[in-house]
UniProtKB/Swiss-Prot annotation:
GO terms for cellular component: endoplasmic reticulum; Golgi apparatus; membrane; mitochondrion. There is a cross-link at K562 (Glycyl lysine isopeptide (Lys-Gly) (interchain with G-Cter in ubiquitin)). Residues 1-23, 73-82, 138-154, 210-220, 289-316, 363-375, 426-726 are extracellular. Potassium-proton antiport. The lineage of its organism: Eukaryota, Fungi, Dikarya, Ascomycota, Saccharomycotina. NCBIfam families: 2a37 (TIGR00932). InterPro entries: Cation/H_exchanger_TM, CPA2_transporter, K/H_exchanger, Na+/solute_symporter_sf. GO terms for biological process: inorganic cation transmembrane transport. The keyword Nucleotide-binding does not apply. Present with 172 molecules/cell in log phase SD medium. This is K(+)/H(+) antiporter 1.
Length: 873
């Protein structure tokens, strides 16, 4: 006893299993399992594979197949006496998993797509079930009841179980694949989601039937009793208890909470454990009781999402991986040592995959899908994953199948799950999906496109789509402004910029008695001008005949305004780009959001509600969307959004920030180099290392990155003058420079209407001698544009030559040193520097000048707006 208390210091072997202290070895086993699972998942995650594959493979590696071949490994690390402890934790995890699976079943969504879901779900279950019954015949005669001491299994029980194993579809894995491939909003994805729920429910019912048949011990009367009791228990839970629980939660205002209270969570867990206990003692399995309990939790106000978010972390991180790793430990591939064994393995894989694909494809085609859509639906329905492993483990523990058959079917589950994602991408590529969306677009949208009108009736043919000169800038217009919200901290700087860029219904300009006729001129130094003139030229009015019915009847002409590129009503779209993790909460939220009308997405997302309020106040047409994406797929998700070449995609990012570490003084740390701030940017905003390279190369619209470096300030002076500075460092202007100029002019124009008194300046390479004159000529009809509106400052600057050994200051460093006045430097935190970015080198995410601006902005605490113009030429 003394040695036991003393531990390893007293000579106790920590790998010796002690029944009086089983926790010691269990902790090591759990750490080993979780470590191997996460290491193996790294390469599989890059191939878009679900984590269950890594967890099962980890168990296979740690089990008798590989590590088990090491002498004394199994007796030391996983002794037989320690397995019950692992199984206890694993079974607790799978009970919670089945409860979460019940929470995922959306009855309202099934009703909405009931016809297609029933047809596809039943057919994709019935056809593989029938072929599974045929496969069970040779399997039974070859492997069943061959080992002495094993439980004798009837053929009917064996056949039902094998057929269920062949025919099930893994709904949780299916839902995650739909999210990762961005199919959950497509017609094929919606059909598969509904059919997967039907298939899943019916599969669990059939599995329960096989367990009941095996537990009845040959008595038909017992079988009937178990079936009746199970059905009665389901009715009790699904009707009186379900409505009673909803009534109690409403009366206690539980559904209105941001997260469930501990008491409500405890009561729901109590309901789940009671149901699992009851189904276990009547001879079914505790997982079915947990599944039934998940079905009765109300979905009002996304309560199931909030409940799952509160409960799921420890089960998903610890318990469930241990369950699937234990399933892998039971796989001994060394038992498959005959040719016929591998013949049955390949036959099982072929039957499981192709019966699902063929039946799903034909049925989906009959319901109205295109051939490739239907094929994708069939491929997705062939996914096995988590559910298959649970089914097989239940069958192994019940003695229905042997370890050899268990190993065969685990291989089938791994292969069928592994091929689902690449096969879906092969038969249903992005290019084909875009064509399907266009063919399914509404006639109203097609008519609008054919008429050349945007959402507000502005003639698109009069809007220039290219930016090759200052004359093009005067005719340019942004189609739709889309802001992609990646983090909560990006909301405030995004709204500040949108307040200047938004093209809402403009108020009428104030009349001024005195008109400033000063033209644009160049300045060699920067000085603060007087308050900006609010003078705006009276808009040109043209007489046109009205196209409205009322005016046609009265035969009256009306006066209409000819909108300039800086006027009119442009639409605003807000995209909440949420990180898709392994959490069940993300799956519940994504599936529930896409069940609603997409025009009302803002009502279900608190971040989008902020932009909805902003658009209402600004009188801007507004739409919104929530996109769940993995970190690796964020660039692809943004690039595949519906957009035109003249749209502007704005991505606000959180940059450098002040830190408060317990003292009343803020910590303002400086960055040593660009790589330091760049890694900080990626980490803060949950972006992959290839994000910017991918987005610049694949996005088919204008793109702007806003980096806010002033987050964390307290008591900021809200009345300081806002400053917007455009940097034109090249001796010539590129298309992205022209886009930056257009945005600066747009900010100036809107600022004149709003009377915000912002300062707008252009810092240009002094080699662009005729820039001011050319700008005045191009905007001769725009009297609002003069030197009181915008300042042009010459910056003597020589472009760096790579071969030169002497380090020269960058353009932004020169501007900060000699181009800004003392007042402007004092207001540097209220300043946004705009710079154009053409396609950077493949080896770097940004060009050298842009990298310098980002670096200086992070250390000097000014905001940066990097713009890139997309050219279809």
């Amino acid at each position: 006893m003394a040695n036991t208390v003393g531990g390893i210091l007293s000579g106790v072997n920590p790998f010796h299993y002690n029944s009086s202290s089983p926790l010691t070895l269990f902790l090591f086993q759990a750490c080993l399992i979780l470590l191997v699972c996460n290491l193996i998942h790294i390469p599989f995650s890059m191939m878009r594979q679900p984590k269950v594959i890594s967890e099962v493979i980890s168990g296979v590696i740690l089990g008798p197949t590989i590590f088990g071949q090491i002498p004394n490994y199994t007796n030391t690390i996983f002794p037989t006496s320690s397995i019950p402890g692992l199984n206890l934790v694993a079974n607790l995890g799978i009970i919670l998993f089945m409860f979460f699976l019940g929470l995922e079943v959306d009855i309202a969504f099934i009703k909405k797509h009931l016809k297609k879901a029933l047809v596809i779900g039943i057919v994709t279950l019935a056809v593989p079930f029938g072929f599974g019954c045929l496969l069970a015949i040779p399997l039974f005669h070859t492997y069943a009841n061959k080992t002495e001491g094993e439980r004798h299994i009837k053929f009917s029980v064996f056949m039902v179980f094998i057929a269920v194993s062949i025919s099930v579809t893994a709904f949780p894995v299916l839902c995650r694949i739909l999210n990762e491939l961005r199919l959950i909003k497509d017609r094929a994805g919606i059909v598969v989601l509904a059919a997967g729920i039907i298939n899943d429910i019916m599969g669990w019912i059939l599995l329960a039937l096989s367990i009941i048949l095996s537990s009845a011990e040959g008595s038909p009367v017992n079988t009937v009793y178990i079936l009746l009791i199970t059905f009665a228990w389901f009715l009790i839970y699904f009707f009186p208890l379900k409505y009673l629980l909803r009534w109690v939660l409403i009366r206690t205002h539980e559904l209105d909470r941001s997260k469930p209270s501990p008491l409500a969570t405890m009561c729901i867990l109590f309901i789940m454990f009671i149901s699992a206990y009851f189904t276990d003692i009547i001879g079914v399995h505790p997982i079915f009781g947990a599944f039934i309990a998940g079905l009765v939790v109300p979905r009002d106000d996304h309560y199931v999402v909030k409940l799952t978010e509160r409960m799921e972390d420890i089960p998903n991180i610890v318990f469930i991986p241990i369950y699937f790793a234990v399933a892998g430990l039971n796989v001994d591939l060394t038992l498959l040592n005959e040719g016929r064994d591998w013949g049955y393995v390949f036959a099982t894989i072929g039957i499981a995959i192709f019966t699902k694909i063929i039946s799903g494809t034909l049925t989906a085609k009959l319901t109205g899908l295109f051939w490739r859509e239907a094929t994708a639906a069939g491929v997705l329905m062939s996914c096995k994953g988590i559910v298959e492993i649970v089914v097989l483990t239940v069958g192994l523990n019940a003695g229905i199948i042997s370890r050899k058959i268990f190993g065969m079917f685990v291989l089938m589950a791994l292969v069928s799950t592994f091929v689902t994602t690449p096969l879906t991408q092969l038969v249903y590529p992005d290019s084909y999906r875009d064509g399907v969306r266009k063919s399914l677009s509404t006639p109203a949208e097609d008519d609008g496109a054919a008429d050349g009108l945007d959402s507000e009736g502005v003639d698109k043919t009069e809007i220039n789509t290219q930016l090759n000169s200052l004359a093009d800038v005067s005719k340019y217009r942004i189609g739709e402004l889309t802001t992609v919200i990646n983090t909560t901290e990006a909301i405030s700087p995004s709204l500040k910029l949108l307040n200047y860029l938004s093209l809402g219904v403009s108020p009428k300009p104030k009349n001024n008695k005195h008109k400033n006729e000063t033209s644009l001129s160049r300045m060699t130094t920067a000085t603060d001008s007087t308050l900006k003139s609010n003078t705006f030229k009276i808009k040109k009015m043209v007489h046109i005949w009205s196209k409205s019915v009322d005016d046609v009847d009265t035969n009256l002409s009306v006066i209409d305004e000819k909108l300039t590129p800086f006027e009119g009503v442009g639409a605003l779209r807000a995209i909440h780009l949420r990180l898709l993790t392994e959490r069940t909460t993300d799956l519940l939220q994504s599936s529930s959001l896409y069940n609603d009308d997409p025009h009302f997405t803002a009502n279900t997302d608190s971040l989008l509600q902020i932009f909805d309020i902003f658009s209402n106040l600004s009188k801007i047409p507004f739409s919104s969307e929530v996109i769940f994406s993995t970190m690796r797929e964020k660039a692809a998700n943004i690039a595949t959004m519906k957009m035109d070449s003249t749209d502007l995609i704005l991505l606000p990012l959180k940059g450098a920030s002040y830190e408060y570490r317990g003292s009343p003084v803020f910590i303002d740390e400086k960055y040593a180099n660009f790589d330091h701030i760049y890694s900080h940017l990626l980490g803060l905003n949950e972006l992959s290392s290839t994000f910017f390279k991918s987005i610049f190369q694949s996005l088919k619209a204008n793109f702007a990155v806003q980096i806010s470096n002033t987050y964390g300030r307290l008591n900021a002076d809200r009345f300081k003058r806002k400053r917007f500075n455009l940097l034109l460092p090249k001796p010539y202007l590129t298309q992205s420079d022209y886009l930056g100029l257009y945005l600066l002019l747009l900010i100036c124009y809107r600022d004149g209407y709003n009377n915000d008194n912002a300062s707008c300046s252009i810092f240009i390479n002094s080699k662009n001698i005729d820039f001011a004159k050319d700008l005045s000529t191009a905007f001769a009809e725009h009297d609002w544009l003069n030197e009181s509106t915008i300042k042009i400052v010459d910056i003597p600057f020589e472009t760096k030559v790579p071969e030169e050994a002497i380090e020269k200051p960058s353009f932004i460093e020169t501007v900060l040193d000699v181009g800004l006045s003392d007042t402007a430097l004092a207001d540097i935190e209220e300043t946004t520097f705009i710079i154009g970015e053409d396609l950077p080198d493949e080896s770097e995410p940004f060009s050298e000048e842009v990298r310098t601006v980002i670096f200086e902005g992070s250390n000097r605490r000014f905001d940066t707006l990097i713009v890139h113009h997309f050219s279809s030429e």
